[in-house]
């Protein structure tokens, strides 16, 4: 009887001892790079949702090795970050020790699942030998003017003691811990991602990525063509610019809105309005950008008491502030045309502001008219459509020096500072004379110093500020300086890790260019869709910078991306707080890793979110036990192949075997694992009914199932008499001629009524088919005492006998 505990440990030990999955370097073979999004090693370990994507890449990796490719299939750890630091603060443990322990647990779990990783290429983002190169990339960006310091509005969480990203805020509180967040201006390191906006947008077209992910990135970059218009402030020499995609509606502008953080606000607010304006600014400081720009939220705002002059008609328009305008987007100011914009209409209606139509159509007493129509109330634009009116208005603005054609982006520069301990130190020194310099490259890595007190400082400095021996430096001329105390965000190390896997032990450069040329771009990258606009955009940005530096040979990092769905429990995402986590260790102990791998691939399409069924692994174990019994006789002390496995081929399984090899190969390539497994079940049913199973087909089937259930298939392969691992046994092939039926079913009619049917060789001779039809006992019964007048034979289909 098959014992999964014994067999799985045996083969995991064998693979480790023999370096079975060491990346091939045969220059005569093609290369294939299959990559998983590496995990953050949390204290909770893996749950059964994690192995879904990992199993998918593992199946493809195992197939590609068998197809004769050199395969790079690595794994590593995204080890810096806030959760480890929070845990360390709570328990008093060292974050480095916490990380090491968590990695050991994750690695144990991954190895129990039988994944074919090349562990010689393992990387950890918190390892100084790794983050030396993260710091090196930062330094190259600084030299190119892509890393800079700026005072920017940020989401500040005093409780976490750091800035948090917009995406990490829910209902004005931090996603992690539910702490309040406040808007404040802080000195931050920024990366100039906006310099790459056009390339990030255009190069999406060439990628084999899910369309929804590409669309999310397009929207995040948010390129829009329009005009920048300058408004003068009444009774003042001050001006402000607005960006609009609809310069043709400028005649309809009836008010303007500034972001509450806009520096102009305090300068132009009248004494009568100052208290109200300041109260409003205080009220909205805990809202994230995402909340503020939510289209469905109630519109709020306050009049500043000041007026601007509409440049096209000289009319005075009131200047308001509202939280839906962000200082960090565009110019931090907008013009409002309520007659033709839904948000402006709702705002104007609520606060009783004028609504001036400039397009013909609709009923603006009921709603904004947002479609096209001839321009009205617009002097030199009257009668024109939108396209022509836009062009003419931009020409007018440029001619009168109060505006110009402009491209705008939603994309912002990347806020690259965190006020925490557990992250990569930023390799910068601030000197007392105001100069800022980089740590010399030959002194990298700038190591994160060991610290016993990593509590947030509560100031814009990280806990590193407390380590005065590390912070304070003196150069050879006696000039004093301080090290940068902010650290990098946890997205830094994950922006380039796939490059380091190619050459993980290189201490002279990030990775050898010729090796990168052999392996890039990544052929298959599988991970969660939640990374669409953060990690995937950051990695593309870093890659393009490195391409411009001549460090990498390709414009894009990941050629093919696939997002696995979620595995839910009781229709909810698994989480410790909900108590609905299924631990893979328990499933493996009871049913085996092969059963778990197979169940996760058979649950449904890889990209679907599906509910976990506790009985699922039991059903795939039953199937695998059937496979074992079909091929292996283990009744005696030594397991041997079943007697039904023979060297001869009677042809009975030809067609189903050819269909199975074809479908499984195509489905594995297309990541349709559930339908591939269904086809293997079809073959199993046919093989169980067959009198004998040709050895060629038995071995071929085992090779097809090996990527899904590698431990059992290694064992069966050994029972079949092979000394080598199945991992490099040549992938199964089929004869296309055998996909076609060798026999056909012929219907026999007597005087138009069906009286019998029989099997005949395909394309058999007409006379032979007619003879077989006439000899059928049931047909002869209906021909007794009659003369056969005519016999019509339709090849491969029907014999029609006319008798009287």
Curated annotation (Swiss-Prot):
Q: Which Pfam families match?
A: Anticodon_1, tRNA-synt_1, tRNA-synt_1_2, tRNA-synt_1g
Can you tell me which residues bind ATP?
576
Q: Name one GO cellular component term.
A: cytosol
Sorted alphabetically, the keyword list is: Aminoacyl-tRNA synthetase, ATP-binding, Cytoplasm, Ligase, Nucleotide-binding, Protein biosynthesis
Main EC class of this protein?
Answer: ligase
Motif 'HIGH' region: list the residue ranges. 39-50
UniProt GO molecular function:
aminoacyl-tRNA deacylase activity; ATP binding; leucine-tRNA ligase activity
> Which CDD domains has this protein been placed in?
Anticodon_Ia_Leu_BEm, LeuRS_core
Q: Which reaction does it catalyse?
A: tRNA(Leu) + L-leucine + ATP = L-leucyl-tRNA(Leu) + AMP + diphosphate
The record's section on Gene3D superfamilies has:
3.10.20.590, HUPs (3.40.50.620), Isoleucyl-tRNA Synthetase, Domain 1 (1.10.730.10)
One example of a Gene Ontology biological process annotation:
leucyl-tRNA aminoacylation
Q: Which family does it belong to?
A: Belongs to the class-I aminoacyl-tRNA synthetase family.
Q: What is this protein called?
A: Leucine--tRNA ligase
Protein species of origin = Lactobacillus acidophilus (strain ATCC 700396 / NCK56 / N2 / NCFM)
Give the encoding gene's name.
Answer: leuS
């Amino acid at each position: 009887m098959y014992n999964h505990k014994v067999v799985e440990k045996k083969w995991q030990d064998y693979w480790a001892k023999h370096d079975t999955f060491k990346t091939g370097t045969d220059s005569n073979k093609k290369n294939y790079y299959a990559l998983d999004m590496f995990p953050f090693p949390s204290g909770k370990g893996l749950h059964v949702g994690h192995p879904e994507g990992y199993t998918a890449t593992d199946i493809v990796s195992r197939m590609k090795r068998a197809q004769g490719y050199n395969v790079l299939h690595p794994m590593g750890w995204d080890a810096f970050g806030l959760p480890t630091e929070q845990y360390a603060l709570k328990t008093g443990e060292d974050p480095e020790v916490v990380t090491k322990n968590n990695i050991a647990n994750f690695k144990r779990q991954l190895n129990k699942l039988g994944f074919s990783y090349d562990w010689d290429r393992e990387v950890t983002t918190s390892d100084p030998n790794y983050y030396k190169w993260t710091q090196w990339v930062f330094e190259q960006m600084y030299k190119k003017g892509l890393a800079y310091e700026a005072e920017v509005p940020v989401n500040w969480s005093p409780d976490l003691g750091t800035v948090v990203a917009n995406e990490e805020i829910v209902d004005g509180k931090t996603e992690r811990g539910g702490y309040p967040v406040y808007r404040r201006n802080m000195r931050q390191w920024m990366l100039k991602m906006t310099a790459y906006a056009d390339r990030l947008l255009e190069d999406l077209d060439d990628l084999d990525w899910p369309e929804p992910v590409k669309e999310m990135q397009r929207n995040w970059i948010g390129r829009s063509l329009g005009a920048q218009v300058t408004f003068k402030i009444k009774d003042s020499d001050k001006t402000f610019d607005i960006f609009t995609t609809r310069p043709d509606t400028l005649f309809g502008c009836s008010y303007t809105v500034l972001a509450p953080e806009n520096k102009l606000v305090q300068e132009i607010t009248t004494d009568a309005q100052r208290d109200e304006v300041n109260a409003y600014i205080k009220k909205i400081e805990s809202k994230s950008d995402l909340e503020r720009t939510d289209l469905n939220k109630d519109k709020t705002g306050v009049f500043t008491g000041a007026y601007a002059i509409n440049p096209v008609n000289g009319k005075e328009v009131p200047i308001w502030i509202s939280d839906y305008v962000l200082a960090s987007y565009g110019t931090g100011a907008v013009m409002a045309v309520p007659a033709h914009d839904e948000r402006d209409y709702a705002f104007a209606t609520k606060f009783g502001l004028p609504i001036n139509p400039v397009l013909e159509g609709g009923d603006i007493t009921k709603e904004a008219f947002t479609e096209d129509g001839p321009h009205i109330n617009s002097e030199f634009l009257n009668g024109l459509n939108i396209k022509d009116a836009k062009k003419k208005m931009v020409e007018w603005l440029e001619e009168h020096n109060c505006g110009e054609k402009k491209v705008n982006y939603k994309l912002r520069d990347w806020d690259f500072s965190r006020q925490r301990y557990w992250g990569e130190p930023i390799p910068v020194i601030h000197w007392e004379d105001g100069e800022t310099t980089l740590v010399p490259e030959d002194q990298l890595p700038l190591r994160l110093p060991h610290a016993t007190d990593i509590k947030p400082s509560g100031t814009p400095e990280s806990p590193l500020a407390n380590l005065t021996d590390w912070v304070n430096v003196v150069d050879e001329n006696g000039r004093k300086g301080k090290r940068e105390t902010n650290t990098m965000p946890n997205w830094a190390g994950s922006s380039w890790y796939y490059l380091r896997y190619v050459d993980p032990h290189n201490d002279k450069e990030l990775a050898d260019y010729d090796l990168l040329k052999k392996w890039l771009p990544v052929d298959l990258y599988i991970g969660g869709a939640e990374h669409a606009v953060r990690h995937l955009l950051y990695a593309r940005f870093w890659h393009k910078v490195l391409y411009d530096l001549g460090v990498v040979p390709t414009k894009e990092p990941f050629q093919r991306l696939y997002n696995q769905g979620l595995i839910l429990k009781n229709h909810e995402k698994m989480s410790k707080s909900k108590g609905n986590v299924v631990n893979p260790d328990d499933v493996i102990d009871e049913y085996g890793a092969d059963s778990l791998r197979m169940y996760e691939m058979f649950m449904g399409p890889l990209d679907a979110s599906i509910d976990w069924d506790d009985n699922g692994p039991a059903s795939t174990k039953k199937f695998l036990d059937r496979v074992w019994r079909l091929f292996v006789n283990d009744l005696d002390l030594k397991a041997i192949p079943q007697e039904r496995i023979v060297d001869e081929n009677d042809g009975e399984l030809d067609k189903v075997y050819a269909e199975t090899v074809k479908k499984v190969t195509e489905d594995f390539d297309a990541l349709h694992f559930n339908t591939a497994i269904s086809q293997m079940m079809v073959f199993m049913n046919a093989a169980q009914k067959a009198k004998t199973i040709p050895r060629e087909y038995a071995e071929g089937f085992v090779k097809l199932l090996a990527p899904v259930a590698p431990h059992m298939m290694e064992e069966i392969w050994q029972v079949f008499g092979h000394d080598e691992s199945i991992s490099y046994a040549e992938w199964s092939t089929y004869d296309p001629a055998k996909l076609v039926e060798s026999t056909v079913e012929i219907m026999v009619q007597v005087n138009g009524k069906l009286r019998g049917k029989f099997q005949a060789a395909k394309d058999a001779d007409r006379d032979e088919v007619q003879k077989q039809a006439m000899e059928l006992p049931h047909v002869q019964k209906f021909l007794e005492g009659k003369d056969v007048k005519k016999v019509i034979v339709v090849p491969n289909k029907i014999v029609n006998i006319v008798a009287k």
